[in-house]
C-alpha cells in the first residue's frame, strides 16, 4: 500500500465512524528514514481531528476510539501515529 492510499483509508474510516468537522492526515515518515527501525512498508502518521463528538471526551478515550477504528491499519501499515484533537 502506498501512502496516498493509506491516507485516503484513514480519512474515510474516521469520517464514516465519527462526526468530524475536519480531518488532516499527514505523512511524517521522512523524519524517520535514518532510524534503525525504519521500514518502507510502515508509515509515520500525524492526524488532526476536529470533532464535536470527541471534543468533550478525555484525550485517552478519544485516542482509544481512533485506535479501534484504525486497528487494521495500525497493525499492518503504521509504525507511529500521533493524534491531535480540537
Model-flagged regions — what are they?
Residues 1-86:
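N-terminal, polar/charged subdomain of small-to-medium soluble alpha/beta proteins
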